UniProtKB/Swiss-Prot annotation:
Residue(s) carrying N6-(pyridoxal phosphate)lysine: K249
Name of protein: LL-diaminopimelate aminotransferase
InterPro entries membership: Aminotransferase_I/II_large (IPR004839), DapL/ALD1 (IPR019942), PyrdxlP-dep_Trfase (IPR015424), PyrdxlP-dep_Trfase_major (IPR015421), PyrdxlP-dep_Trfase_small (IPR015422)
Catalysed reactions listed for this entry: (2S,6S)-2,6-diaminopimelate + 2-oxoglutarate = (S)-2,3,4,5-tetrahydrodipicolinate + L-glutamate + H2O + H(+)
EC numbers on record: 2.6.1.83
UniProt subunit comment: Homodimer.
EC class name: transferase
Keyword Phosphoprotein attributed: no
Amino acid sequence: MANINENYLKLKAGYLFPEISKRVKIYSEKNPSAKIIRLGIGDVTLPIVPSVVDAMVEASKEMGTVGGFHGYGPEQGYSFLLKSIADHDYGSLGIKIDESEIFVSDGSKCDCGNIQEIFSTDSKIAVADPVYPVYVDTNVMAGRTGEIGPDGRYSNLIYMPATKENGFQPEIPKEKADIVYLCYPNNPTGTVTTKESLKAWVEYAKKNNSIILYDSAYEAFISEPGVPRSIYEVEGAKEVAIEFRSFSKTAGFTGLRCAYIVIPKELKGRTRSGEEVSLNSLWNRRHTTKFNGVSYVTQKGAEACYSPQGKKEIQTSIAYYMANASKIRDGLKKAGYEVFGGVNAPYIWLKTSDNLSSWDFFDKLLNKAQVVGTPGSGFGPAGEGYFRLSAFGKKEDVEEAIARITSL
């Protein structure tokens, strides 16, 4: 009998979203006629926009011809998509990113989880609290976190509390972290950061030889001027930061699967003997070993997101979701809830009513309003007493959900 990776036994019982699904299933079985409105997990509801559909249809037709058939593609991504990403997502900001620094993948969740494989297992990890669970759980699996304590924190992680008192901006740790996870616009709090704050993080990383893992999956939802869209807007960030982007929420690709990661050539890691190693080369080796690339049809769809018509259609979808966010924010505020986020991100972070715990509030909304959200404590101990609602629902469902919640 083979021995197992015992680090998996250190994971908290049940990943957050399966636990939500389990509770909803139990309720549904007992109340089969109940209309449950789901504002929890961040899946999109609008269809793929016409420009993208048309591009994928044409690509599919190509695949049915001798001259247009594509088998295994380049693992890093087709050049036509890499160029579009470099030109539109970075060139438009005055940032020079080379095609060889971009790696197309099947999702930011995968990238955020897999990137830790190229770092030493004794690396010291710093995460915000609350935090997207994937950052923590994948490091638990790798054996970096130590044991979980009674307070829900792992002994070897550096936790950076993001609270109402500090504007949900995690403070730079006093100790040295080898790897720092940052996410802006933030999941779960829906808040954003400033360029000055990012400058301070870059300075910290340079001083401590740290690597920043910057999750910018929700960049397209930024609406206010002056909010940074990329950490590479900060001078010197290419020497210390890896950035993650996704088409999932931007263009509704949750069922298609396409994202990318940027690893600048300037970015280096070190061996135990002190030798510098290119992280771009290291990730390229990992990526080409474990991944066969995103399909040609999907990448042609992703390329169409950057066409003038594609951009216009996608902005219409984003505006739809952000109108939902405004409805949620305004409705909850009028009902007396303390609400954060939802301006530059599709998530609304609210204080639970009557000082209920996050899971008690979840049960209250499910049982009394038939509305499903996400308990804040599932994102970390500092999320206790908070709750996340997603703006990705249908307009009429969002309106009905808020009416139900505010009538409690």
